[in-house]
Amino acid sequence: VCSSDLAVARGVTVGVLLEVNESGETSKSGCNPAYAIRIAQKIGTLDGLELQGLMTIGAHVSDETAIRRGFEHLRRTRDRILASGEPGTQSCRELSMGMTGDMELAIAEGSTIVRVGTAIFGERAFI
């Protein structure tokens, strides 16, 4: 079932973030960065969905330059989506990037949403 169809059937508009796999790591989800603009423009045409922004998880490396590069690329991608002027893309303003370990880098690169679970709840206990 398409989420767009479900939202329309319920008479609601659902805000969505498009996840982009900026690190290219196979352990992470998200679309290929090369397709992010086209996918965002497609989402912008779907009834019942409002593209509110993009999200990514930073590269799992110790090299801060590499981490920042992914965040910077996502910000530039968001800016290109907004500049495209395509219908339904003007609401794409949020950048959800950065977690406890890299939130300062993400904020420096323009993040508007950070996910700080470990800083609040501590390390996960894996069973």
Model feature map: region roles:
Residues 6-14:
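Helix C-cap/alpha-to-beta connector motif
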